Amino acid sequence: MIIDRVEVETINSFWKLELLKEVYGLISILPILTLLLGITIEVLVIVWLEREISASIQQRIGPEYAGPLGLLQAIADGTKLLFKEDILPSRGDISLFSIGPSIAVISVLLSFLVIPLGYHFVLADLSIGVFLWIAISSIAPIGLLMAGYSSNNKYSFLGGLRAAAQSISYEIPLTFCVLAISLLSNSLSTVDIVEAQSKYGFFGWNIWRQPIGFLVFLISSLAECERLPFDLPEAEEELVAGYQTEYSGIKYGLFYLVSYLNLLVSSLFVTVLYLGGWNLSIPYISFFDFFQMNKAVGILEMTMGIFITLTKAYLFLFISITIRWTLPRMRMDQLLNLGWKFLLPISLGNLLLTTSFQLVSL
């Protein structure tokens, strides 16, 4: 069979088209891979910072042997957990036992979809961004409850129940605070919320317009992250390790990862909702606007936005780490009373007050 020149060119064009499709497919997943790499690095930095700050508060030496200044200690711990034996409970539900950590990790990772780290640097600028985060974050306690129930251990089961009760108690005040911010910004999009704060400069940040909501959001975020003084689901003195008691190896490492991912997500949302996101309200912004047509300056602006966002997030991280070594753990009844009898009425009153001001200003 003889193939003429036209057929050869047609075959080559189809081959090039398929090759282009593969290249476009790789390019489309590049932002996701970049974000995952950035999240991994951020978690390692947070673990190192927590150990160094905790050591400084307790007047002792922190990690110093694994790498320079102990920077590789988190990698060493993760590698150790990776090669540990994966022990399964003999009388537990093995399928639920294995699925629980995965649900918790995936639900937290999905929250990064709607977080704008910088100007035009967000994976999904959705019109319901903040509500999507609240909905996704409500899935994580289901994974913790599954982990506790499937372990066939009383300590694990109690820890799972505590995690579910704590999440339900503090999710509602958190939602009311987000609703108040959305009313001020006239949008549920995280990008629109940041841009609404940038209109009035530094004093347009929602921390000044919603101080009560900020405090409620801060406390509720710490409770959602299960940080001291709200770490009742894994209280060592009462429940050994809570829902993590029967876990070992990589599954235990996933729960360890979830706690720091939760802390990172909460810090970023505090920054986006109350601290102006990537905006700093200093003269360099007008300088970048003047040279907006330059692509290099646009990349520099995006990089500066990411740096500013992360710097503000680290402020919240420092506060949460300091609180861990400052306040004692609460009892379960105190935790529930704080959520239902104190934070819920305050957040509801703040929402009604914000709604009234918005109606009057129309």
Curated annotation (Swiss-Prot):
Annotated EC: 7.1.1.-
A GO molecular function held by the record: quinone binding
Membrane topology: Multi-pass membrane protein
Catalytic activity: a plastoquinone + NADH + (n+1) H(+)(in) = a plastoquinol + NAD(+) + n H(+)(out); a plastoquinone + NADPH + (n+1) H(+)(in) = a plastoquinol + NADP(+) + n H(+)(out)
Pfam families the UniProt entry points to: NADHdh
Top EC category: translocase
Matching InterPro entries: NADH_UbQ_OxRdtase_su1/FPO, NADH_UbQ_OxRdtase_su1_CS
GO cellular component annotations of the record: chloroplast thylakoid membrane
Origin superkingdom: Eukaryota
Transmembrane residue ranges: 29-49, 103-123, 128-148, 164-184, 202-222, 247-267, 303-323, 335-355
GO aspect biological process, one term: aerobic respiration
Sorted UniProt keywords: Chloroplast, Membrane, NAD, NADP, Plastid, Plastoquinone, Quinone, Thylakoid, Translocase, Transmembrane, Transmembrane helix
Subcellular location(s) of the protein: Plastid, Chloroplast thylakoid membrane
Subunit structure: NDH is composed of at least 16 different subunits, 5 of which are encoded in the nucleus.
Function per UniProt: NDH shuttles electrons from NAD(P)H:plastoquinone, via FMN and iron-sulfur (Fe-S) centers, to quinones in the photosynthetic chain and possibly in a chloroplast respiratory chain. The immediate electron acceptor for the enzyme in this species is believed to be plastoquinone. Couples the redox reaction to proton translocation, and thus conserves the redox energy in a proton gradient.
Family membership: Belongs to the complex I subunit 1 family.
Protein name: NAD(P)H-quinone oxidoreductase subunit 1, chloroplastic
Organism: Triticum aestivum (Wheat)
Chain's gene name: ndhA
